[in-house]
Design a protein with these regions (language model features):
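A structural detector for beta-sheet-dominated domains
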Residues: 14-16, 40, 59, 94-95
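Short, intrinsically disordered low-complexity segments
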Residues: 35-72
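Short, low-order "capping/linker" segments at domain edges
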Residues: 51-55, 100-113
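Short, compact, well-ordered microdomains
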Residues: 65-108
Length: 113
């Protein structure tokens, strides 16, 4: 029996859209680069509505260790691909250091300012 230990790093993508379409794009990307991810359905509740979507998880898997920068780069690429196929305008990536909000909208208005 073998135990492998690597530094912990987790990165999550949050994206609205059809989970089946997003899962298929994740399969394509994972097959292309050799990657293992998790996908969980989620519900976003926001001012004025709600929308179903996904939480996609990436980790530093000790069987195939990687750097945090590389994992984050893969998350950004995957998020962009999933956003496009799901016909969405934005995604969110959360890791221990940063939260990245990416939108292809030409407007972003915060109510109350």
């Amino acid at each position: 029996m073998e135990n492998k230990i690597e530094p912990t790093y987790t990165c999550k993508i949050y994206l609205a859209g059809d989970i089946d379409i997003i899962k298929q794009e994740c399969r394509k990307y994972c097959l292309t680069i050799g990657l293992c991810i998790t996908i969980n359905p989620t519900l976003f509740i926001y001012t004025g509505g709600e929308e179903f979507g996904v939480e996609i998880g990436l980790i530093n898997y000790p069987r195939f260790p990687d750097t945090s920068d590389s994992i984050k780069s893969k998350a950004i690429i995957l998020a962009q691909r999933c956003r496009d196929v799901a016909c969405q305008h934005s995604y969110l990536i959360v890791d221990p250091q940063d939260t990245i909000y990416n939108s292809n909208r030409t407007y972003n208005i915060k109510v109350g300012e």
